[in-house]
Amino acid sequence: METALFVFAHPDDVADGMGGMASLLKDKFDLHLVCATKGERGLPGRSPDETAAIREKEEERECGLLGGKLDFLGRIDAELIVDAETCRRAAEIVRRTNPAAVFTLWPVDNHPDHEAVSEIARRAVLMAGSPAEIVYLEAGEDQTELFTPSVYLDISEVMDRKLELVRCHECQNPDDRLAQHSLRKATRRGKEIGCAYAEGYRPLPASDSDTPSIFSALSQTRMPVE
């Protein structure tokens, strides 16, 4: 099978941002997750090493549910920058996996790690000489800026699965807050296209014009309502 590659900043970014997409792709593509950091600063009161160990296990649990492979780039939460070594590591994974599509976060975001990983993913595709389609997705409701979906995915049939992925990240989900955030976001996007739950995306065309979009493999793809 072809590979879908997800390049993101923190554990839980995939589950919250594209858990529906990942659930729909898992039986059609080999999934490969690349996490730049281990979210070391995501638990106030815990040391970075302790937090990293907790969040790594949670990300491995999510990846197991998706039947995917997981790599970490070894960078530090809240210190992610677009440097040559990180881009080189990411590019090597792109070369090795030869993905049909690379999913990453939208580059305009008030979290510096999100902006950095977006550029790292873009440069990795270029450095690898890959024809992969780059697909941008949104992060949290109060983080991503200037994002208007150009294509939607109806995830109504897998919303429960998405929430299961989100709930793998127990340390980020006190009182089910992260799951409820994901539910609100999917409900809002669903209303925009007339379904129960949806995710929004902005794909860039593959450099090879003959390469079909990954969305062509998904019957749940929807276009914006005029």
Predicted feature residues:
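Short glycine/proline-enriched coil/turn segments at helix->beta-strand junctions
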Residues: D27-D30, L66-G68, S130
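A conserved beta-strand->alpha-helix junction
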Residues: A36, C63-A78
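Short, conserved clusters of charged catalytic residues that mark active-site
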Residues: D16-G17, I54, E85
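Glycine-rich phosphate-binding loop and adjoining beta1-alpha1-beta2 segment
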Residues: R41-K69
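Active-site phosphate/pyrophosphate- and oxyanion-stabilizing loops and adjacent acidic/basic residues
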Residues: S23, E60, E119-R122
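ATP-dependent adenylation/pyrophosphate-handling site
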Residues: E2-D49
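Metal-dependent de-N-acetylase/amidase catalytic core
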Residues: M1-V7, R46, K69, I76, ...
